[in-house]
UniProtKB/Swiss-Prot annotation:
The lineage of its organism: Bacteria, Pseudomonadati, Pseudomonadota, Gammaproteobacteria, Enterobacterales. GO terms for biological process: lactose catabolic process. It catalyses: Hydrolysis of terminal non-reducing beta-D-galactose residues in beta-D-galactosides. Keywords: Glycosidase, Hydrolase, Magnesium, Metal-binding, Sodium. This is Beta-galactosidase.
Length: 1025
C-alpha cells in the first residue's frame, strides 16, 4: 500500500466488514500451531520455544461508537484519552458498552451483509521492542488466536491486513513492517461485521481481542504446514504414520526432512525424505512438499479411555544435517469409521457420553485460561463424560491438546450459525456466502486435523440446509476421509451428514414439525432406507432445575446399538458477574446489562454453575452414564454381576466395596478387587449376611472405587455405584408402656389438644392446625395448610413471558385454572376424644372463581405418646391441569442448622431425576438443602423419605420434602438469587406427591406422563412428633 492508502480513512472507506466475499486481506494460510523449535530435544519434550513471544498483557485502549468516530492520528500514536485493557479480554467486561445475550434474534436489524452504522469499535495499541536477531533473517509473524468480530491491523502506521471469523486465528507476516527498537501495533476491532450474520449462536455477544496474541519467528526456509495421517491394519496390530509436509522459502534438493516418532523417551521410529512429492498429474509433482512414512509394530492405541500419545517431531535440516527448525505435535493411533450403521473407534462401537460446551467464564467472559480448561476436562472425566461438542465454534487451540492428553472425544464445529434468519437457510443456500462459509470450515480443518481427539467434523449449527452445506460436506469428505461429518440443520438426516444428529428428539414421542419433523429416536432408526447411526447433537436441556427423564434416554441407548448416545445441553451456566453498590458480586443473565434484545435466563443451561460448582443434574449424569453396570442375580446366594462398558480399558484400578445397611445403619461390608476385561463381566459372590435383630428395610449398596490416583482423579474416586432394597425384616413390635391420654379442650373458635408438654391448636373457623407448642414454646409461624403449587421451574415457564404468553406452558395453565389464587373453603372441622387419642377431622374445598379445584380431607390422630398422625386424602377436579404437587406446608419457628433424614440423598432429587440419589441416613447443614439456581425456582426436594428430623421435630412416613429459608411465594416473585431474603424460621414442604421436572427440552411441556399427577384421587400419611 502507498502511505495514503495506509490511512484509516482509506481502509474504512472499503467497508470490508460488509462484504461477504472479503474475509481477509494478507492473512496467512491456516496450519497447525507452530513453535519453530531450534532444538529437536525441545520439540520432543514440548518445552519452551524461544521463537514464540507472547504479546498478552496490558494494551492501550479507546472505545468509539463507530469506526468513523476514530481519529486518523490513532493509527500513528496513542490517544490522550486512551485507557488500558488486558489482552486477552472482552471489552464489555471492562464496562465498554454492554454484553448482549440473545438465543436466536440478531442483536441488530437483519439486512445482510449490512450492519448498523453505530458499530462499537475498540482501538487497541501496543508498543514493544524488537532486537535485530529476529529482523536480520527469517520471518516474523503475528498471531491473533481470536478477535470478535473483525479487525484491521497496522504496524508502525502501515496497514498490514484484515481478518474476520472470531473463533479461528488470523496470522500475518510482519517482517517488512518491523524495525529494530520500538514498534507500535494498532488494532481496530469492530463489534459487528457481515461475519456476525454467521455467528448467531446462543450465547453472550461480546467483542474484543479475547484470545492470545503472539509473535512467531520462522527461518526463511521453513515448514509451512504438516498433516499427520495414522493408518491401522484390520486387527490394529500394525500402524503407519504418514506425514505430509509443506515447505517455503528457498526450497531445494539439498534439504532434508526427518521424522522422529517418540513414545515417551523411546524413539519408536524414524523416516527421512527430501523435498518433492510423488507425481500428481501430467505436469509432475510438487517440489515444495514431501511425504514421510514410518511403520509401527503393535502401536499403543489412542482412545478416550486409554489416551496413549506419541510425539512426532518433524525436522528440517540442511544437507550437512544442521537443524533449521523443528515442528512437533502429539500423535494418537486410532481409526474412526462408520460400518453397518455403527460409529466405530478402533473397531468398537462407541457410546457417546457427551456434553456441549461453550467457552465461558463468569468474570472473564469468553476468555479461556489453561486452568479453567483443565478444570472442565477433569470434571467431565470424573463424572463419566467421554465426549464434548465444541458448541458452536472452534475452541481455543490448547483445548484440543488437553482433550488429546486426558482423553475426550471431540466434535469440532465450524463457526457457522444463522438461526435468526428467515428462512434459516437464507445464507447457506446463497452462493454469495459460500466463500465466507468455506473459510470457516476449511481453516478449522487445517488448524485442527492432527488431533486424535477430534473424531467428527461438524459443518456448524442451526443454519438450515443449503447448497453451501452440500459443497462443504463434499470438500470435507475429499480432504479428510478419515472422519465422519455431522450436521443437524435441515432435519438432522440430510445428505450433508454421516450421522443422524437431531437435537431434542424424544425417546418415544414424535414431534411432527412442518418441513423438519423430529421423530422419536427409536422411530428414526427404522425409517425406510435409513442405516446411519443416531447420536443426539443436543438433548436433556439442563436449564435450572431440570434434567428429568435422562435415564430414559440411556435405557434406549443401551437397548438399541445404533442409538449411540448424545451431547447434553449443556456444560456450564453462562451467567456473568456484576457488582452491586457495595461491591458485592452477583450473577447476571440476559437483560441485566440493559441489553436488548435478550432472552433472559435462557443462557443458564449448565450441568455446572458458571463457577464450575455442580448442579444436582451433574450427579444424575454421572450415575446414569457410569461405565459399570450391576445386576443382583436371583437365587439364595447373594451374587452380583458387574459388567464393564469400557471398550479398551481393563479394570486395573478398581475395587468394588459393598455394604449392607438397615435403615441407614451398617450391618456388614466388604471389598473385592475387580478384574474385568473390556466389555467383560465378573460375578461376585457375597458372604452370608447377618440377621438383623430389629425390623426395617435392608439395602445392599455397591461402589466401584479407584484406589490409585489417575491423571484426572484423586485416589479413592468413586466411578460407579448401585443399590438394591432387600427383604424387610419383620418383627413383632414390643408393647409400649401406656402413657397419659391426650386431653381435648373445646374453646370458642378453637380445638386444643394437650399431651404432656405438647399442645396443639386447631382453628375451628378455618380448619387448620394453627399452632403447636413444645414446653410452652410456639413451634409454628404459619398454619399447616395444603399446597398444590411450586415456584415455577424454567421448564414450567417454557417460552412464556409477560409480552408473549404461551398458553401451553405449565405455569400458564396453572394460572388460568387458578392454582396460584385458589382459596380454601371449610367444609368440615370436627373433633372426637377416644380412649387413648384425639381425632380432629377436617375437609376443605380449594376454589377459584366459584369452581372447586381440590377437595382435601384430613384426619389428625394425636395419641398418648404425643405423636400426631395425619391422614390426607385429596380429590382433584376433572378437567383441571395436573397439579405440581400434593402436599402440606408450614413455617417453623425455630431455626436449626442441621437437617437429618432417612431417604434419598444427599443431593436434591425429583421423581424423574433420582437415579443418582442413594437411600441412607443423611445429615446436612440447613443451607445445603437449598440449591442456589441463579433464577430462583422450586428446589431442594428429597424423595423417598422415611424419616425426617429437624431440631426437636420428627416426621415419618413415605414422603418428599424440602426445607428452606425461602417461601415458595418469594422464590416465585424473585428474579435473581442474590435478591432472596432469608425469612423468619424455616419453610417446610412435605409432599405426598410431586410432579417431575422434565427436561427433554425447556420450551415445551416435557414431563413424561408417568411423572405427571394425572390421577383424580390421592392419599398419603405423615406422622409428626
Amino acid at each position: 500500500m502507498t502511505p495514503e492508502r495506509d490511512s484509516l480513512a482509506a481502509v474504512l472507506a472499503r467497508r470490508d466488514w460488509e462484504n461477504p466475499a472479503v474475509t481477509q486481506f494478507n492473512r496467512l494460510t491456516a496450519h497447525p500451531p507452530f513453535c519453530s523449535w531450534r532444538k529437536a530435544d525441545d520439540a520432543q519434550r514440548n518445552q519452551y520455544a524461544a521463537q514464540i513471544r507472547s504479546l498478552n498483557g496490558v494494551w492501550k485502549f479507546a472505545w468509539f461508537s463507530s469506526p468513523q468516530a476514530v481519529p486518523e492520528n490513532w493509527r500513528l500514536e496513542d490517544l490522550t484519552e486512551a485507557g488500558t485493557i488486558n489482552v486477552p479480554s472482552n471489552w464489555q467486561m471492562y464496562g465498554y458498552d454492554s454484553p448482549i445475550y440473545s438465543n436466536i434474534t440478531y442483536p441488530f436489524p437483519v439486512n445482510p451483509p449490512c450492519v448498523p452504522a453505530e458499530n462499537p469499535t475498540g482501538c487497541y495499541s501496543l508498543t514493544f521492542c524488537m532486537d535485530d536477531d529476529w529482523l536480520t533473517e527469517g520471518q516474523t509473524r503475528i498471531i491473533f488466536d481470536g478477535v470478535n468480530s473483525a479487525f484491521h491491523l497496522w504496524c508502525n502506521g502501515r496497514w498490514v491486513g484484515y481478518g474476520q471469523d472470531s473463533r479461528l486465528p488470523s496470522e500475518f507476516d510482519l517482517s517488512e513492517y518491523l524495525q529494530v527498537g520500538e514498534n507500535r501495533l494498532a488494532v481496530l476491532v469492530l463489534r459487528w461485521s457481515d461475519g456476525s450474520y454467521l455467528e448467531d449462536q446462543d450465547m453472550w455477544r461480546m467483542s474484543g481481542i479475547f484470545r492470545d496474541v503472539s509473535l512467531l519467528h520462522k527461518p526463511t526456509t521453513q515448514i509451512t504446514d504438516f498433516h499427520l495421517h495414522t493408518h491401522l491394519n484390520d486387527d490394529f496390530t500394525q500402524a503407519v504414520l504418514e506425514a505430509e509436509v509443506r515447505l517455503a522459502g528457498g526450497v531445494n534438493d539439498d534439504l532434508q526432512l526427518v521424522l522422529h516418532l517418540w513414545q515417551g523417551e523411546t524413539l519408536a521410529g524414524e523416516a527421512r525424505a527430501t523435498p518433492g512429492s510423488e507425481i500428481i498429474d501430467e505436469r509432475g509433482g510438487y517440489d515444495d512438499r514431501a511425504t514421510l512414512r514410518l511403520n509401527i509394530n503393535r502401536p499403543a492405541l489412542w482412545s478416550a479411555e486409554t489416551p496413549n500419545l506419541y510425539r512426532a517431531v518433524i525436522q528440517l535440516r540442511t544437507a550437512d544435517g544442521e537443524l533449521i527448525e523443528a515442528e512437533a505435535c502429539d500423535v494418537g493411533f486410532r481409526q474412526v469409521r462408520i460400518d453397518k450403521g455403527l460409529l466405530l473407534l478402533n473397531g468398537k462401537p462407541l457410546l457417546i457420553r457427551g456434553t456441549n460446551r461453550h467457552e465461558h467464564h463468569p468474570e472473564r467472559g469468553q476468555v479461556m485460561d489453561y486452568d479453567t480448561m483443565v478444570q472442565d476436562i477433569l470434571l467431565m472425566k470424573q463424572n463419566n463424560f467421554n465426549a464434548v461438542r465444541c458448541s458452536h465454534y472452534p475452541n481455543h487451540p490448547q483445548w484440543y491438546a488437553l482433550c488429546d492428553r486426558y482423553g475426550l472425544y471431540v466434535v469440532d464445529e465450524a463457526n457457522i450459525e444463522t438461526h435468526g434468519m428467515t428462512p434459516m437457510n437464507r445464507l447457506s443456500d446463497d452462493p454469495d456466502w459460500l466463500p465466507a462459509m468455506s473459510q470457516r470450515v476449511t481453516r478449522m480443518v487445517q488448524r485442527d486435523r492432527n488431533h486424535p481427539s477430534i473424531i467428527i467434523w461438524s459443518l456448524g449449527n442451526e443454519s438450515g440446509h443449503g447448497a453451501n452445506h452440500d459443497a462443504l460436506y463434499r470438500w470435507l469428505k475429499a480432504e479428510d476421509p478419515s472422519r465422519p461429518v455431522q450436521y443437524e440443520g435441515g432435519g438432522a438426516d440430510t445428505a450433508a451428514t454421516d450421522i443422524i444428529c437431531p437435537m431434542y428428539a424424544r425417546v418415544d414421542q414424535d414431534q411432527p414439525f412442518p418441513a423438519v419433523p423430529k421423530w422419536s429416536i427409536k422411530k428414526w432408526l427404522s425409517l425406510p432406507g435409513e442405516q446411519r447411526p443416531l447420536i443426539l447433537c443436543e438433548y436433556a436441556h439442563a436449564m435450572g432445575n431440570s434434567f428429568g427423564g435422562f435415564a430414559k434416554y440411556w435405557q434406549a441407548f443401551r437397548q438399541y446399538p445404533r442409538l449411540q448416545g448424545g451431547f447434553v445441553w449443556d456444560w456450564v451456566d453462562q451467567s456473568l458477574i456484576k457488582y452491586d453498590a457495595d461491591g458485592k458480586p452477583w450473577s447476571a443473565y440476559g437483560g441485566d446489562f440493559g441489553d436488548t434484545p435478550n432472552d433472559r435466563q435462557f443462557c443458564m443451561n449448565g450441568l455446572v454453575f458458571a463457577d464450575r460448582t455442580p448442579h444436582p443434574a451433574l450427579y444424575e449424569a454421572k450415575h446414569v452414564q457410569q461405565f459399570f453396570q450391576f445386576r443382583l442375580l436371583p437365587g439364595e446366594e447373594r451374587r452380583i454381576e458387574v459388567q464393564s462398558e469400557y471398550l479398551f480399558r481393563h479394570s486395573d484400578n478398581e475395587i468394588l466395596r459393598w455394604m449392607l445397611a438397615q435403615e441407614g445403619n451398617q450391618l456388614a461390608s466388604g471389598e473385592v478387587v475387580l478384574d474385568i476385561a473390556p466389555q467383560g463381566r465378573q460375578i461376585i459372590l457375597l458372604p452370608a449376611f447377618p440377621q438383623p435383630e430389629t425390623a426395617g428395610q435392608l439395602w445392599l449398596t455397591v461402589r466401584v472405587e479407584q484406589p490409585l490416583a489417575t491423571s484426572w482423579s484423586e485416589a479413592g474416586h468413586i466411578s460407579a455405584w448401585q443399590q438394591w432394597p432387600l427383604e424387610e425384616k419383620l418383627c413383632v413390635s414390643k408393647p409400649t408402656r401406656a402413657s397419659v391420654a391426650p386431653v381435648l379442650t373445646m374453646r370458642d373458635g378453637e380445638f386444643c389438644v394437650t399431651q404432656g408438654n405438647l399442645r396443639w391448636q386447631f382453628c375451628r373457623q378455618q380448619g387448620w392446625l394453627t399452632q403447636f407448642w413444645r414446653d410452652d414454646e410456639a413451634q409454628l409461624l404459619t398454619p399447616l395448610i395444603d399446597q398444590f403449587t411450586r415456584a415455577p421451574l424454567d421448564n414450567d415457564i417454557g417460552v412464556s413471558e409477560a409480552t408473549r404468553i404461551d398458553p401451553n406452558a405449565w405455569v400458564e395453565r396453572w394460572k388460568a385454572a387458578g392454582h396460584y389464587c385458589a382459596e380454601p373453603a371449610l367444609l368440615l372441622c370436627d373433633a372426637d376424644e377416644l380412649a387413648d387419642a384425639v381425632l380432629i377431622t377436617t375437609a376443605h374445598a380449594w376454589q377459584y372463581q366459584g369452581a372447586t379445584l381440590f377437595i382435601s380431607r384430613k384426619t389428625y390422630r394425636i395419641d398418648d405418646h404425643g405423636e400426631m398422625q395425619i391422614d390426607i386424602g385429596v380429590e382433584v377436579a376433572s378437567g383441571m391441569p395436573y397439579p405440581a404437587r400434593i402436599g402440606l406446608s408450614c413455617q417453623l419457628a425455630q431455626v436449626n442448622e442441621r437437617v437429618e433424614w432417612l431417604g434419598l440423598g444427599p443431593h436434591e432429587n425429583y421423581p424423574d431425576r433420582l437415579s443418582s440419589a442413594c437411600f441412607d441416613r443423611w445429615n446436612l447443614p440447613l443451607d445445603a438443602m437449598y440449591t442456589p439456581y441463579v433464577f430462583p425456582t422450586e428446589n431442594g426436594l428429597r424423595c423417598g423419605t422415611r424419616q425426617l428430623r429437624y431440631g426437636a421435630h420428627q416426621w415419618s412416613g413415605d414422603f418428599q420434602f424440602n426445607i428452606s429459608r425461602y417461601s415458595q411465594r418469594q422464590l416465585m416473585e424473585t428474579s435473581h438469587r442474590h435478591l432472596l431474603q432469608a425469612e423468619a424460621g424455616v419453610w417446610l414442604n412435605i409432599d405426598g406427591y410431586h410432579m417431575g421436572v422434565g427436561g427433554d427440552d425447556s420450551w415445551s411441556p416435557s414431563v413424561s406422563p408417568e411423572f405427571q399427577l394425572s390421577a383424580r384421587h390421592y392419599h398419603y400419611q405423615i406422622a409428626w412428633k
